[in-house]
Amino acid sequence: MPASQTGKVAIVTGGTANLGRLFAEALSADGANVMVHYNSARRADEAGETVKALEAAGVQAASYQGDLTDRAHITGLVDSTVERFGSWDILVNTTGVIVRKPLAETTEQEFDNSFSVNAKIPFFLMAEAFTKMADNGRVINMVTTQVAVTAATYSCYAGSKSPVEHFTKAFAKEIGPRGVTVNCIAPGPQKTSFLYGAETDDTLKWLAGQTISGELGEPADVVPVMRFLAAPETSWVTAQTVYVNGGMISPIN
């Protein structure tokens, strides 16, 4: 059974769609109050619907819109959360952007944006957590299976997610004395708009064939891992990357 998060406060970035929405729903179902972040004003309606769905679980919920590549919005998100709920215990960072191009064809703008979204955001969210997260908190960063083995045309995506593993390990040691754990989840390819927007049908079939089951993952497959890492009882699991990819790759094969 999922551990009770009653009275805890969670921030879920990218919390209106795909994994972010599922994570927010799972945390609220476990009793946590949730601040749902979303990037674009175009998602305001989705954010409102998400907040209503979370409140239906009997918890408090709110939303914050902002481009987190701007450090001021990171601070604003955290400060708004603490002001609204009184504390901050859990961070689940799902922000990400895919550039699927050969390295030599990737533009400087695409490179800069990839590193701003995939690496800068989690780095400075963790910086905020150092002084503003409650003791015994939980930090969970979403990376990708490709931090272990990178496929062709994914140099920018995998390269901009890889630093997050190192940030996570270092930050786990820096904040660990306060009982805060810091971990990564590295999903494989899943049936989401995030993947479908970057891949052809042939590539999707090939990716599915790399898993043991021959199927792409579902976002729901990752939720139990997030719940485990966010649980109050999971205090001795930190500085780790958990691969959730249907057996398609591990960091040692």
Report each predicted region and the residues it spans.
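A conserved structural motif in NAD(P)-dependent oxidoreductases
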Residues: 211-222
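Conserved glycine-rich Rossmann-like NAD(P)H-binding loop of the short-chain dehydrogenase/reductase
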Residues: 32-47
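Catalytic loop of short-chain dehydrogenase/reductase
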Residues: 140-163, 168-177, 189-190
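Alpha-helical segment proximal to the catalytic Tyr-Lys
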Residues: 131, 173-177, 235
